[in-house]
Amino acid sequence: MPMSGIDAKKIRTRHFREAKVNGQKVSVLTSYDALSARIFDEAGVDMLLVGDSAANVVLGRDTTLSITLDEMIVLAKAVTIATKRALVVVDLPFGTYEVSPNQAVESAIRIMRETGAAAVKIEGGVEIAQTIRRIVDAGIPVVGHIGYTPQSEHSLGGHVVQGRGASSGKLIADARAVEQAGAFAVVLEMVPAEAAREVTEDLSITTIGIGAGNGTDGQVLVWQDAFGLNRGKKPRFVREYATLGDSLHDAAQAYIADIHAGTFPGEAESF
């Protein structure tokens, strides 16, 4: 059961609105496989996000733009199979919703039907509001994503903080558009803490921050960053709670050494 936050045996979208009203923070982690999903679910995380970040941390690619809907569905199936309590949300990957609202609805329907997820996430603000509304009208819950949107990295000029200065007005407009379109939550990525706090106070839906300070209703991190499986350079907004990469490296070396020494398998591991 969770240490705090949403108190429910099975989390639904309505629980996020209730948590905001009650001033309860919500926790979100990414997951792309059954083993991590089961562990995080049992730990009490409120939402599991099958993010297109899998392109980077699972498939080893430089950008999220290349991951396909078919690949996302395979990963999401594994997560939903292992999850009993947390709400599972799946990213709509690049190229699956931009052409038209109809394309977006068809992609979202595939995700819901083939994975058993509870919602989809889509990047964009004012320009994507009509698409969000169409997905919601099809009976599919939506999480928005504004601020820095990784699928737009080239048009944004790279990994750049959004919502500073004059652009803060756009952030508010995007947030309101996402809410009015029917999303039940919105991710705020790489925006100034004060701007994220203002958006959070302005909206009635849940805000989930990543690199957006602690004034949002909840937080999300890529688990390989948060728990140190990724041994490379990490974003400034990541707090490392474990060093799993180093632990795995040391364990692999110990395994190799035992094989070379002829001590594995021993009597205890033999029939």
From Swiss-Prot:
One cellular-component annotation, GO: cytoplasm
Cofactors required: Mg(2+)
Cofactor note text: Binds 1 Mg(2+) ion per subunit.
GO term, biological process aspect, one: pantothenate biosynthetic process
Pathway connected to this protein: Cofactor biosynthesis; (R)-pantothenate biosynthesis; (R)-pantoate from 3-methyl-2-oxobutanoate: step 1/2
Reaction(s) this enzyme catalyzes, per UniProt: 3-methyl-2-oxobutanoate + (6R)-5,10-methylene-5,6,7,8-tetrahydrofolate + H2O = 2-dehydropantoate + (6S)-5,6,7,8-tetrahydrofolate
Active site: residue positions: E189 (proton acceptor)
EC numbers: 2.1.2.11
HAMAP family reported for this sequence: PanB
Family in the record: Belongs to the PanB family.
NCBIfam families in the cross-refs: panB, PRK00311.1
Protein name: 3-methyl-2-oxobutanoate hydroxymethyltransferase
UniProt organism field: Corynebacterium glutamicum (strain R)
Gene: panB
